[in-house]
A protein has these predicted regions:
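Substrate/ligand-engaging "lid" and interaction regions
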Residues: 1-169
Length: 169
């Protein structure tokens, strides 16, 4: 096994240090399944488990549009899913040559540390969404998009971002 090439593994669970956690899981299973010392050495020497931050809202199976989408793609897909257009994938490591994800049109950031990006995401995006929930519901507005079209809600969010959220970074 030592002669086999390794893998670059991109963990996508939304937990801190997801690459390290996945590596620990793989090591435990390798031990439980008695894959041996050669496998353990190959795993250690040839493979990289990257920590990542994935930011994209995935809304689930598109029940109302599923038939139309399946007809368009020419197959039934019971695992069909929908997602918002915005996406960000922050990956710890330097594998841009091996994985030219940006060339495929993905919004990817290669970095030495995911943590600062997570801090920004949690504070700015999650903070803004949290700040909008109750005022928006009181105004009978159900989506962020609708909230941003309302001048009073947009002004409220702008104030929250500039006065309270951004100064914490």
């Amino acid at each position: 096994q030592a002669h086999l090439p390794g893998l670059v593994i991109l963990a996508c669970e939304l937990i801190d240090n997801n690459g390290r956690e996945l590596e620990n899981c793989v090591r435990r299973y390798a031990e439980q399944w008695q894959l041996g010392a050669d496998f353990a050495r190959w795993l250690e020497a040839k493979n990289t488990f990257c920590n990542t931050l994935v930011d994209r809202i995935v809304t689930g199976y598109p029940r109302e549009e599923a038939a139309e989408i399946c007809a368009k793609i020419g197959t039934d897909d019971p695992l069909l899913d929908t997602a918002e257009p915005y996406h960000l994938w922050v990956i710890e490591g330097n594998f841009e040559q091996e994985l030219p994800l940006q060339a495929a049109g993905l919004n990817v950031v290669w970095t030495d540390q995911v943590a600062p990006y997570k801090k920004m995401k949690v504070r700015i995006l999650n903070g803004a969404h949290t700040a909008l929930v109750f005022p928006s519901l009181l105004c009978r507005v159900e989506t962020v998009s609708e909230s941003l079209k309302d001048k009073d809600l947009a002004a409220f969010l702008d104030c929250c971002l500039h006065r309270y959220i951004l100064p914490t970074l």
